[in-house]
UniProtKB/Swiss-Prot annotation:
The lineage of its organism: Bacteria, Pseudomonadati, Pseudomonadota, Gammaproteobacteria, Enterobacterales. This is P21 prophage-derived protein NinB. Gene3D superfamilies: NinB. It comes from the Bacteria. The gene is ninB. Pfam families: NinB (PF05772). Belongs to the ninB family.
Amino acid sequence: MKKLTFEIRSPAHQQNAIHAVQQILPDPTKPIVVTIQERNRSLDQNRKLWACLGDVSRQVEWHGRWLDAESWKCVFTAALKQQDVVPNLAGNGFVVIGQSTSRMRVSEFAELLELIQAFGTERGVKWSDEARLALEWKARWGDRAA
């Protein structure tokens, strides 16, 4: 069976999903899994994230170091999720155990953008046009901005 995904935004979408489930013939030897969850972050949210991370990476020195956008992403997701740190395999450093942003729900991703905005604003980051528009859009539309 192929994977089906329904984004439910209206009663019509809901009925389409219900109809699809009703068409499945149950087979005890091949169970089907139905998952209902909030949508993961959108590509638009991801683009906004990288615009903001790029601005922070170019303008904020962190404990005497300039971090790239990818490293800042790790710092922010660790702060948001209060993640753990474990020694690396060689024993000469540490690894942050955390959550991938691609697996974040829309609301979690919105929290991440809010955290980055607050952090950057506290440190005087001058937001690029793309990041500024992303943050203004988030402020205006909230979680619906995705």
